[in-house]
Amino acid sequence: DIAGLIRGASRGEGLGNRFLANIRETDAIVHVVRAHGDEGVVHPDGRVDPAADIEIVETELIYADLEQAERRLERVERQARGGDRVAIAEEAWLRELIDALRAGRPARTVPPPADAPRALAALAQLSAKPVLFVANVDEGSDVEPDAVAAHARDQGAVAIAVSARLEAELAELGSDEAVAMRAELGVGESGLKRVVDGAFSLLDLIAFFTAGEDAPAQSLHMRRGLSAWHAAGKVHTDMQRGFARAEVIGWEELVDAGGYIAARERGTLRLEGRDYVVADGDVVTIKFSA
């Protein structure tokens, strides 16, 4: 959770350097943008302009990336002059990247070439990270403002709308009351679910469950397209090392059957090998040798 960046953060203004260092460690950025008109919440600039707020943060990320890319270019130029083919490819990309950053375009618009794999690790660019824009809207609205939606489309990002005030009020209610209030206001899914779904989509993640007839269920996540062997490693390295097979069933099938015994009788519980690609919502029981 990182407080809003101010102008000059890339030069160390406020707590800029600390905030930027924190952002550098993340897989993605969830950028919460004010889009509500509550006069009781003071804006530092005395206005409500989500597009301008987005620009302030993105500009600081771009400035930080530009400074780092220019320093990196100085080192790579020396290696390229020595005939290092990887450095030559990276130098060309860095020059293209620097031109884009100087023009105000984020690093995610200039992906590195396949033959310069060390570039991304060396730079850890802030503006290359995938972004989920969360427009904090007035109560009763679940549509992101046009300015936020348009900016997300231009940047290849994802945008959703959440009313933080409404979510705080609903959190104080019982589940049935909360559902009734959402229906009355015309607001569908909870804000938390929309944020989680947006983040999973942005990072191309799936959720799977580990459970057994005598084991508690837990939810885990991993990149889409990974195998049962990778899923075993998410649970415990011993399971991955001694992987034998996996019992797999979709969670809806398991709920519909009413449990493992009935699912096995129906034939919906299946055995899969290490290369089985785990699907979103799978319930996986790892069989392994110690």
Predicted region positions:
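Switch II of P-loop NTPase G domains
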Residues: 2-31, 36-59, 111-123
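Internal, well-ordered alpha/beta segment that forms a basic, Gly-enriched binding/recognition surface
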Residues: 55-67, 71
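C-terminal-of-GTPase-core extension/linker across diverse P-loop GTPases
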Residues: 70-290
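Conserved nucleotide-binding/hydrolysis micro-motifs of P-loop NTPases
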Residues: 3-6, 34-40, 47-51, 62-63, ...
